[in-house]
Amino acid sequence: MKHVVSWSGGKDSTAMLLSMIKRGMPIDQIVQMDTGKEFPAMLRHIEKVKKHIHPLKVTTVKLDFDYWFSEHVKTRGVDAGMKGYGWPDFKNRWCTRLKSNAATTTIYSRNKYNPRRSDGVKKYRTDVIQYFGIAYDESKRTLNNLEHEIKYPLIDWKI
């Protein structure tokens, strides 16, 4: 079983990562998203945590925020043909989705897919467990993540 931590550098994912290390939980890979729009203080924090968790290595995936914000041409829905997703907000969470998709692609591109299921849907390997730092009071955010094995340690620990 491969254990992969999705780490944003934010308070919840950092609390999860450090608690997993402290508890001796297995960690095979740490994936961190870089939108290119992080504040300097966040970048310093990320570097500080990387030094603290050494020798564990962090795979940083760079995202082109500017492209998705203003250049990407939408292909579906009422906005088909329009450019860009605009500012992310609580209803328009494209940035969250983009980061999640990039993390999943990075993780599973290094771990082959299972053969297609009988219904033709591509299924991720079941020997990878992905960990997300979602706080206990936000547990409703986890209800739609049923496609592959995902764990939410902060929720399990009621943090």
Describe every region a protein language model picked out.
Residues 1-159:
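Nucleotide-activated chemistry modules centered on ATP-dependent adenylation/adenylyltransferase
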